[in-house]
Each structure stands twice: as C-alpha cells, then as structure tokens.
Amino acid sequence: MFSGSIVALVTPMRNDSVDVHHLRELVEFHIAKGTHALVAAGTTGEAGTLSHSEKLLVIKTVIEQAKERVPVIAGTAMNATKDCIELTQQAMEYGAHAAFIMTPAYIKPTQEGLYLHYSHIAQSVAIPIILYNVPGRTACDMLPETVARLAKISNIIGIKEATGQMTRLQQILRLCEGSIDVYSGDDLTAAQWLLSGAKGVISVTANVAAKLMAKMCDLAMDDDQAGCLRIQEQLMPLHELLFVESNPIPVKWAMKKMGLIGGELRLPMTELSEKHHQALEKVLKNLELI
C-alpha cells in the first residue's frame, strides 16, 4: 500500500508554535523531490512535545497541502489506548491514509499488553495501521512473535522497525509470511533492508536529501543493487551526522542551513552543539544541498 522513501517530517516551529507556513512549504518540497509518502507528527516531528490540538493541526495541515498527490500517514501514538483511539479516529476523519502508531513509551507494557493495545485500536478505526517499534526511545521492544499475531488483523498493514538489526527483519518476514509490510526505521542500514525485503524506509535523512533517498528506494525496487548501495555509500556521512545528537536536533539544524525552516526546537530539545556544525555543513556542501 505504501512503499519507497517515506519522510518522517519535522514540525517547523516559530515562537514556540507550529509554523504552518513552513510546514506547507515542506510538503511542496517533498512532492517536487519525489518523496513517495509523508509521515506527519511522528518522532521526528517532535510529537512527544506537541499537545493534542497541535498534533491535529500538523496532521490536518499536511493532508490539506498534499491534496492527495502523495499519501499522508498520521502519527497518532498515545500511551493510553483510549487516547490513541481518539486521536486516530480524528486523523481518519481529516483524511489520513494510514495511522502510524509507536509502542507506548516509558510504561513498558508486556507483549500481551502490546497485542491488546494495537488490536483494540485496529478494531476501533477503519484505517490502515503501521506499527512502530523503536526500543531505543521507548524502552519497549515489540518482538517478532507479537508482530506476527498483530499481522493477522486485516487493517494492521505494516511495521516500521527501527532496531536496524537484519535478523529482526528476517524474523518478521519469516513469521508473517507476507501478511505485513516492513519498513526500515534506520537510515544507516536502509539500503540493506530494502534489498532484503523491506517495502520502504521511513526516513529522517529524507528531510534534507529527499531526492537521493527517493532515488535509492527506486533503485532498490528495480533490483538495482549496485545503484542502491552506491547512493547509500554517498549518503552515509550524512546519515551518521544526523544522529550525533537526539533526533530531530541535527536534522533541524541542517534544514535551517538549507533555508527550509527556521530551525527552532521545543524544550527540552536544544540546538545542535557547535562542535558538530562544521562537519555537518561540510557534508551538506559535498552533497550539493547548500
């Protein structure tokens, strides 16, 4: 249903509020560069610091600006199942093509708790759902066996797996037998995942190198292994630098240098440390992004 380069959009801020103007411009930027789909209000979009109404504003703005030209996947993760259902229903009413739901953070549910969380949500909304497993940020790891159980639910159609472990991809593909699409959630290993059965990548790097990420995915889907890996090698220094501090700190700094956004973050996120500025600027210049 969704494939290729799916950007995990940043949320532009101005004076500690959502910068709707620049958010709309980002949608146009990605459509022009060939990005295949947009994720609004996910981790890279600072969803953890957005209020309920701000999340809805971001989702609604992206949907309205995209005008059905590319799919919009709404980040609707909430720790409480009932709150997640409510937000997902609202995103569906706005016209989101799918919901993107991270595992609950901090509370560390059991595998059975994760199954019940997602199955209750899926039964309550008539919209495709993409699971999101990112244990490095949530302290909660959804195991392949749980993914396989959830894959039997008709509107749970995909998972963003951010461990970057090739064995994890292989386990999910084997256990689910094609009943769920897998998306790379780790830019550093995305090419290898794409060439090993992943349907696409939900990417931080695509915020700045949108055209190259889309091309890399296109080459992978065309089984051009050499071409895909060549672009991945070209992008590797950028991938690495975009994670020298917590996401989205480096990517927002890079986008500010590119003139795409103002670069403001919401506390407790702070601006990129000065010691990383020169290296990131050099990589952006090498890729002809600035």
Swiss-Prot record:
Pathway: Amino-acid biosynthesis; L-lysine biosynthesis via DAP pathway; (S)-tetrahydrodipicolinate from L-aspartate: step 3/4. Homotetramer; dimer of dimers. PROSITE patterns: DHDPS_1, DHDPS_2. It catalyses: L-aspartate 4-semialdehyde + pyruvate = (2S,4S)-4-hydroxy-2,3,4,5-tetrahydrodipicolinate + H2O + H(+). GO terms for biological process: diaminopimelate biosynthetic process; lysine biosynthetic process via diaminopimelate. The active site is at residues 132, 160. Pfam families: DHDPS (PF00701). The gene is dapA. The record marks 43, 106 as: Part of a proton relay during catalysis. Keywords: Amino-acid biosynthesis, Cytoplasm, Diaminopimelate biosynthesis, Lyase, Lysine biosynthesis, Schiff base. CDD domains: DHDPS (cd00950). Catalyzes the condensation of (S)-aspartate-beta-semialdehyde [(S)-ASA] and pyruvate to 4-hydroxy-tetrahydrodipicolinate (HTPA). Its EC number is 4.3.3.7. This is 4-hydroxy-tetrahydrodipicolinate synthase. SMART domains: DHDPS. Belongs to the DapA family. Its main location: cytoplasm. It is an enzyme of class 4 (lyase). Disulfide bonds: none annotated. One of its GO terms (molecular function) is 4-hydroxy-tetrahydrodipicolinate synthase activity. NCBIfam families: dapA (TIGR00674). One of its GO terms (cellular component) is cytosol. It comes from Legionella pneumophila (strain Corby). It is found in: Cytoplasm. Pyruvate binds at residues 44, 202.
